[in-house]
């Protein structure tokens, strides 16, 4: 029992300086989103916001957490699926992610890092028909929430003491054989 108390006290002592070195940030981002399902892929524009905290640790390293809310214009439609003139579409909608970042301070103004964590995407599907079916409906839409994991890497440059720009590559793999490759540029502020 004493060993557990000693370990907890030691962890608390080391956590206090880490919290004191915490750096909060928020960013807006945009870039290329390539959504894939099965063998098909469709590119679109990815946009969103992220916020997080980085904690400096000894040796020029840092560890952090980041939450992201994004959306995409990636959409793929096929025509004449069940009848002439109909259309079936699949589109990548909102994307939520919570990741842990680990990296190194390359210089006073640059960071190189990798990250990984959980992601949840909403995928929309729709079917439009020029004729009414037996129930009187010609259109149908549905949304599916897919859980998955995200991995990636990034490079961040401080423009001023509070303003930064960064570039990231993100790979997300979800249920139902759905994945995304994203190249993102972000501009943010530290506070």
Show the residue positions of the predicted features.
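Gram-negative outer-membrane beta-barrel domains
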Residues: 4, 10-13, 17-191
